């Protein structure tokens, strides 16, 4: 069974609908959605002036998927949401990052695993911890420890949002 952890983010248009659409696209592509984190609002990362993001993390499984298959699914979800890649770290309808696949490590420039910046981004670590309190990032350590090591201002910048991505 291939298990992937994916980060979702949106700051253009109906942000909540974009995140929900990503979950629906993953399901339609045959992935079993194991867990969906609460949604968080966060300031943009990377220095480009833009609106705040809504962020979440999903854990998905598929017995027949390899790491590149998860990347293809992530890009398909982005495409379905109208994602364009005009400005690095710029505004986007949907961003889906493959954070981890079965603890695999890879230096492939097309898909580096674990995601090279996951360990330093509170907007990834907070929701990841929600769906897997024992999560580890290969080569970095426990998600809980990585989050605790970040500056308080960064952790505090990840604000709970009332948006629900799945029915409870």
Regions found by a protein language model. Give the residues of each.
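Short, surface-exposed acidic-centric catalytic microdomains
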Residues: 21, 25-65
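Flexible, gly/pro- and Lys/Arg-enriched active-site loops
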Residues: 45-54, 64, 68-168
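Extreme N-terminal starter segment of soluble prokaryotic enzymes
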Residues: 1-6
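Short N-terminal binding/cap micro-motifs at the start of the first secondary-structure element
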Residues: 14-16
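Short hydrophobic/aromatic beta-strand micro-patches
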Residues: 7, 59-61, 101
